[in-house]
């Protein structure tokens, strides 16, 4: 069973939300955004309900700083969530899983996290897209579903064959840039030139 909890900084400590609200208003010029709230969402599997509840105030949150919720507050706000791409290391999830394991003295649970943004104000579709584009770094993250999954176990298709590249070490600067674009690589020209020199020997 998957257990879910939302954690939000108390208003007087919500510096991240206040800073992002300021950025959106000043940099994106979206004055119609009146308020912004940020929640850290934790989905946990392979633990008991008793252990999950025990960890609410010790692992997931700090009672003096945070508010916790079993469900998102009901509002008329626009809500979206952001999670790491599959394969990206999630430091928050890993630390959480390790802490739960220490508390339970048992097996390490499966933990997935996401950041949930709650936007208040009348936002046009184009404004919402601009905010999402500002918040979501496509190299490492993506928009997440708001629904709770049945399981956190994910089956990935393992490729039966891997493409072999030929002529990589002979590419010139323009061809290297085209190579980066073609494969959507998370590196700049200097990075790939270093790789080319390395393999060229």
Please place each PLM-identified region on the residue numbering.
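Core nucleic-acid recognition elements
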Residues: 1-201
